[in-house]
């Protein structure tokens, strides 16, 4: 049996960094090297201030960094020395050419494959960690076969990650399952068993699933599509609840107690974000269209359409509640990350809500406890979001929630940070213009509505009528836009 003693991971991002840190932590006899072309990112991994925020990550890294966990820009040497190479690079949605806006861009995967074969001799296991379309492993193998050399034996596996940002370390230490896909040949199965042995250091054998390569690749896309579908489904019900007087939380509890349905991912909100859900669902849509399955493609496209609708609907509600105009009005945006306990802003609903309000001339004062000012500016300066001067003219980054809300017409909660439940809302109300509005896009203030109304707030929340005198709104009038639109200008910083 092949014994893995040295691991190289290409890509030091949200997947590669935490995953390999946990592997090093759980397998002290294995030397793990995480490499990246981004020198600043590697320097951050080697510093006290890690490049990403994730609860528990710092403690894991510090327990083994410099012992059996290393971060480096020396990619070629790390590949040459490794028994196993993880490919954990970005697979963004294409912004140009065929499949624009839906297909995955595999240029970084291809670059990794070419670099691996160039720097490899003998036997090596190459493992997809990035989310890729079905049969991406076949493309990697074709590159290997076309560049083979004497005694070179590269085995390709699929080992998708199922971690969630904000709970990544917990998910990695105690996964629901580990999925490993490989060729159904003796050589392929030998590679599968070798990778299984790494995870068996801490994962029970019954939680390690082995499949063929294509099933493993599709399982990752399907899992994210199903989770996104759940969110869009409950968000569609939230619109119905607001129209009828029902409470979406009560409806979610009622249906979630049905064991056939379950209660996870039934939290209505302003919409899902993050690097995976939209990208992977669109990739699935494109795959279905390419395979001449238009009905299946349209089905999954509706998951994205509902998410877009929920964001536009929420923004319309803000505008209409503020007497049908937000022009020159100060609005506090609390939360910019796509979810709590992470600093990741990719596809964050806060970007979309900010875009809609900026287009109406609102002055936004934004606060997030983990997203740096520079990242907010870059995100809002994306070509699909703002005009050249909009960010500098309409956006202020606040140092705390109280500063953001001072003199505001409304505060809008876009991220479910726990700290937003503990704010001194009497203090905030005194400093806001009246009537003072709260738009709770994450329902973090459930249970506080009576108290907040007593203070004097007008409250609007997802999936429930709270304020007794609410101005009717007409959802869907805001035009769509996408962060996947091809750039025609450079972002400002």
Swiss-Prot record:
<feature type="binding site">
    <location>
        <begin position="11"/>
        <end position="16"/>
    </location>
    <ligand>
        <name>NAD(+)</name>
    </ligand>
</feature>
<dbReference type="Pfam" id="PF03721">
    <property type="entry name" value="UDPG_MGDP_dh_N"/>
</dbReference>
<dbReference type="GO" id="GO:0015012">
    <property type="term" value="P:heparan sulfate proteoglycan biosynthetic process"/>
</dbReference>
<feature type="binding site">
    <location>
        <position position="36"/>
    </location>
    <ligand>
        <name>NAD(+)</name>
    </ligand>
</feature>
<feature type="region of interest" description="Allosteric switch region">
    <location>
        <begin position="129"/>
        <end position="135"/>
    </location>
</feature>
<feature type="binding site">
    <location>
        <position position="442"/>
    </location>
    <ligand>
        <name>substrate</name>
    </ligand>
</feature>
<dbReference type="GO" id="GO:0048666">
    <property type="term" value="P:neuron development"/>
</dbReference>
<dbReference type="GO" id="GO:0005654">
    <property type="term" value="C:nucleoplasm"/>
</dbReference>
<comment type="pathway">
    <text>Nucleotide-sugar biosynthesis; UDP-alpha-D-glucuronate biosynthesis; UDP-alpha-D-glucuronate from UDP-alpha-D-glucose: step 1/1.</text>
</comment>
<feature type="binding site">
    <location>
        <begin position="267"/>
        <end position="273"/>
    </location>
    <ligand>
        <name>substrate</name>
    </ligand>
</feature>
<comment type="similarity">
    <text>Belongs to the UDP-glucose/GDP-mannose dehydrogenase family.</text>
</comment>
<comment type="function">
    <text>Catalyzes the formation of UDP-alpha-D-glucuronate, a constituent of complex glycosaminoglycans. Required for the biosynthesis of chondroitin sulfate and heparan sulfate. Required for embryonic development via its role in the biosynthesis of glycosaminoglycans. Required for proper brain and neuronal development.</text>
</comment>
<feature type="binding site">
    <location>
        <begin position="276"/>
        <end position="279"/>
    </location>
    <ligand>
        <name>NAD(+)</name>
    </ligand>
</feature>
<feature type="binding site">
    <location>
        <begin position="161"/>
        <end position="165"/>
    </location>
    <ligand>
        <name>substrate</name>
    </ligand>
</feature>
<feature type="active site" description="Proton donor/acceptor">
    <location>
        <position position="220"/>
    </location>
</feature>
<keyword id="KW-0520">NAD</keyword>
<feature type="binding site">
    <location>
        <begin position="220"/>
        <end position="224"/>
    </location>
    <ligand>
        <name>substrate</name>
    </ligand>
</feature>
<dbReference type="GO" id="GO:0005829">
    <property type="term" value="C:cytosol"/>
</dbReference>
<keyword id="KW-0597">Phosphoprotein</keyword>
<dbReference type="GO" id="GO:0042802">
    <property type="term" value="F:identical protein binding"/>
</dbReference>
<feature type="binding site">
    <location>
        <position position="165"/>
    </location>
    <ligand>
        <name>NAD(+)</name>
    </ligand>
</feature>
<dbReference type="Pfam" id="PF03720">
    <property type="entry name" value="UDPG_MGDP_dh_C"/>
</dbReference>
<keyword id="KW-0560">Oxidoreductase</keyword>
<feature type="region of interest" description="Important for formation of active hexamer structure">
    <location>
        <begin position="321"/>
        <end position="325"/>
    </location>
</feature>
<feature type="binding site">
    <location>
        <begin position="130"/>
        <end position="132"/>
    </location>
    <ligand>
        <name>NAD(+)</name>
    </ligand>
</feature>
<feature type="binding site">
    <location>
        <position position="260"/>
    </location>
    <ligand>
        <name>substrate</name>
    </ligand>
</feature>
<feature type="binding site">
    <location>
        <begin position="89"/>
        <end position="93"/>
    </location>
    <ligand>
        <name>NAD(+)</name>
    </ligand>
</feature>
<dbReference type="InterPro" id="IPR001732">
    <property type="entry name" value="UDP-Glc/GDP-Man_DH_N"/>
</dbReference>
<feature type="region of interest" description="Disordered">
    <location>
        <begin position="88"/>
        <end position="110"/>
    </location>
</feature>
<dbReference type="GO" id="GO:0050650">
    <property type="term" value="P:chondroitin sulfate proteoglycan biosynthetic process"/>
</dbReference>
<feature type="binding site">
    <location>
        <begin position="338"/>
        <end position="339"/>
    </location>
    <ligand>
        <name>substrate</name>
    </ligand>
</feature>
<feature type="active site" description="Nucleophile">
    <location>
        <position position="276"/>
    </location>
</feature>
<dbReference type="GO" id="GO:0003979">
    <property type="term" value="F:UDP-glucose 6-dehydrogenase activity"/>
</dbReference>
<keyword id="KW-0119">Carbohydrate metabolism</keyword>
<keyword id="KW-0007">Acetylation</keyword>
<dbReference type="InterPro" id="IPR008927">
    <property type="entry name" value="6-PGluconate_DH-like_C_sf"/>
</dbReference>
<dbReference type="GO" id="GO:0006065">
    <property type="term" value="P:UDP-glucuronate biosynthetic process"/>
</dbReference>
<dbReference type="GO" id="GO:0034214">
    <property type="term" value="P:protein hexamerization"/>
</dbReference>
<protein>
    <recommendedName>
        <fullName>UDP-glucose 6-dehydrogenase</fullName>
        <ecNumber>1.1.1.22</ecNumber>
    </recommendedName>
</protein>
<feature type="region of interest" description="Disordered">
    <location>
        <begin position="466"/>
        <end position="493"/>
    </location>
</feature>
<dbReference type="InterPro" id="IPR014026">
    <property type="entry name" value="UDP-Glc/GDP-Man_DH_dimer"/>
</dbReference>
<feature type="binding site">
    <location>
        <position position="41"/>
    </location>
    <ligand>
        <name>NAD(+)</name>
    </ligand>
</feature>
């Amino acid at each position: 049996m092949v014994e893995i003693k040295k691991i190289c991971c290409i890509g030091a991002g949200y997947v590669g960094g935490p995953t390999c840190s946990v592997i090093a932590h759980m397998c002290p006899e294995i030397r793990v090297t995480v490499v990246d072309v981004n020198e600043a990112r590697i320097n951050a991994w080697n510093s006290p201030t890690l490049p990403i925020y994730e609860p528990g990550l710092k403690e894991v890294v510090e327990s083994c960094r410099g012992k059996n966990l290393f971060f480096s820009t020396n990619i070629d040497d790390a590949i040459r020395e490794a028994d196993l190479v993880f490919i954990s690079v970005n697979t963004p949605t294409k912004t140009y050419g065929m499949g624009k806006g839906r297909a995955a861009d595999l240029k970084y995967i291809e670059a990794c494959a070419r670099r691996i074969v160039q720097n490899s001799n003998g036997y090596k296991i190459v493992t997809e960690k990035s989310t890729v379309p079905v049969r991406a492993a076949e493309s990697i193998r074709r590159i290997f076969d076309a560049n083979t050399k004497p005694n070179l034996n590269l085995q390709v596996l699929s080992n998708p990650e199922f971690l969630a940002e904000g709970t990544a370390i917990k998910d990695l230490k105690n996964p629901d399952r580990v999925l490993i896909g490989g060729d159904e040949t003796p050589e392929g199965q030998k590679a599968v068993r070798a990778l299984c042995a790494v995870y068996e250091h801490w994962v029970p054998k019954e939680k390690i699933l082995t499949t063929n390569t294509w099933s493993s690749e599709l399982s990752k896309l399907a899992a994210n599509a199903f989770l996104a579908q759940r969110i869009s489904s409950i968000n569609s019900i939230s619109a119905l609840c607001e129209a009828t007087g029902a409470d979406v939380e009560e409806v979610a509890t009622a249906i979630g107690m049905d064991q056939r349905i379950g209660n996870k991912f039934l939290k209505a909100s302003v919409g899902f974000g993050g690097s995976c859900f939209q990208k992977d669902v669109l990739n699935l849509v494109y795959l279905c269209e390419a395979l001449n399955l238009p009905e299946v493609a349209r089905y999954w496209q509706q998951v994205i359409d509902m998410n877009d609708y929920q964001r536009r609907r929420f923004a319309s509600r803000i505008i209409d509640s503020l007497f049908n105009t937000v022009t020159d009005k100060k609005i506090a945006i609390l939360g910019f990350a796509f979810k709590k306990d992470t600093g990741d802003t990719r596809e964050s609903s806060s970007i979309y809500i900010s875009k809609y309000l900026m287009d109406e001339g609102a002055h936004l004062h934004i606060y997030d406890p983990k997203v740096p000012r520079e990242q907010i500016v870059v995100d809002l300066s994306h070509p699909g979001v703002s005009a050249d001067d909009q960010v500098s003219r309409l956006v202020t980054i606040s140092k705390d929630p109280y500063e953001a809300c001072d003199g505001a017409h409304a505060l809008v909660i876009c991220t479910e940070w726990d700290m937003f439940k503990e704010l001194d809302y009497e203090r905030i109300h005194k400093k806001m213009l009246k009537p003072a509005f709260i738009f709770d896009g994450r329902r973090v203030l459930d249970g506080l509505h009576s108290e907040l109304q007593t203070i004097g707030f007008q409250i609007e929340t997802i999936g429930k009528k709270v304020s007794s005198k609410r101005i009717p709104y007409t959802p869907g009038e805001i035009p769509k836009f996408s962060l996947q639109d091809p750039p025609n200008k450079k972002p400002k910083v």
